[in-house]
């Protein structure tokens, strides 16, 4: 696979991630976290709540653009020989994409009506995506010196995830609701920021083609 092909796959990945960033920031700037539930703010409102607003199309566009960019990023890394088709890295990256598609396909619970099967699937898909991406980045890039920015961003997302799972753990041994223990909207945006950043960092790594040098450095 030549350098031009590397760059093409990498740029598509970066573009998909950038579209998701623009979509979320635009929704946050215009709606400020408000959804179909009055009084919601960025502190507590999740990004997925935008699906019930007039900006629902922008939310879906951002998620699907990120999914498309991520699968093409994986394809580029596989074709470049950096990732084996059947490896922890490729499987975890595929799970990240599956999670994103699930987030888009199954809207979260509409609490104006009540819990739903779609909302439960959405929650599982969200957790699948959140956990899979940093694990995929570490599996793919941790041994490559030139990919360190992606690795650092993956560790950043893990730090935010620890806050989320810590709240869930506390709720299991107390009467507190996990989503009220933490500012869920801020925590979720922290996770998303670092994970989308990691996708962009991997895309830039692919564009530069620096994995070739990294592979040589690893050779005995």
Say what each PLM segment does.
Residues 90-104, 159-169:
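Small-polar-interrupted transmembrane alpha-helices in polytopic inner-membrane proteins
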Residues 99-145:
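Membrane-proximal helix-loop-helix units in multi-pass membrane proteins
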Residues 8-15, 82-95, 147-159:
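Interfacial segments of alpha-helical transmembrane regions
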Residues 60-74, 78, 130-134:
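Hydrophobic alpha-helical transmembrane segments
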